[in-house]
Amino acid sequence: ADIAAQIVVDYGFSNVSVNAAGDVACRGQQSPGRPWVVGILHPDSNKEVVRTVELTECSIATSGLFERGNHILDPHRGVHEVRLDSATVIGPDGGLADALATVLLIEGERGMRFFAGLPDWSGYLMRGGRAFYFGPAFESAEQPRRDFPTQRSNT
């Protein structure tokens, strides 16, 4: 999505959002004074949004099992095992966001150590009907659905 968005920007369009199989790159604004709004889906439903985030000049990627099933291997043990239902990462690089989302899915909250020293990055982790989040993308007062409890993680 990052590469496609950059191509569009290089052609002179400064406001663009590209969705490439669920990974989204946002450049500029949706309309004057309004950032792009991207929804984070419920891990059990690809149609139900649990949280929205406002984005400019960044990318968002989610790893989970809801679309492609259990396709992710724990590299330490070589088995299909994850510690979260889904992991969403927001940051300046879409490829790294995708990789970090997969790491978080496998490592769970332990994977948040990879974010030390990455102040521009955010994460939204869901497991067992609860959400944990961190980073600047989630500093707004807006809250997710009331029946999907969340808690801010200290990183």
Feature-to-residue mapping (PLM):
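Mature catalytic core of soluble alpha/beta enzymes
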Residues: 1-155
